[in-house]
Amino acid sequence: MARMVKCIKLGREAEGLDFPPYPGPLGKRLWEEVSKEAWADWMKQQTMLVNENRLNLADARARQYLARQMEKHFFGDGADAVQGYVPPSA
């Protein structure tokens, strides 16, 4: 049976992550409070941030920026908006 969590992002019970997605206390908190669905949404947001800001993930400053954005996305007031992004209309 899948592990269920009260997802902090979705505000409801959902299937939890299989393992901590990040090292340290932040990774433990993500594992305990974030669902697979919310993590997948973050991965899309992270990809847009990397691409639109032309981040080089070999650069420690870029990785630190993404870590701050991830924390803001889940536990703060939301990650930075991607400049110029217009969501597709249905």
Swiss-Prot record:
InterPro entries: Fe_traffick_prot_YggX, Fe_traffick_prot_YggX_sf
Single GO cellular component term: cytosol
Domain of life of the native organism: Bacteria
Biological process annotations from GO: cellular response to oxidative stress
Organism, as annotated: Polaromonas sp. (strain JS666 / ATCC BAA-500)
Similarity field: Belongs to the Fe(2+)-trafficking protein family.
Entries under NCBIfam families matching the protein: PRK05408.1 (NF003817)
Alphabetically ordered keywords of this record: Iron
Function: Could be a mediator in iron transactions between iron acquisition and iron-requiring processes, such as synthesis and/or repair of Fe-S clusters in biosynthetic enzymes.
One function term, GO molecular function aspect: iron ion binding
Xref: HAMAP family: Fe_traffic_YggX
UniProt name for this protein: Probable Fe(2+)-trafficking protein
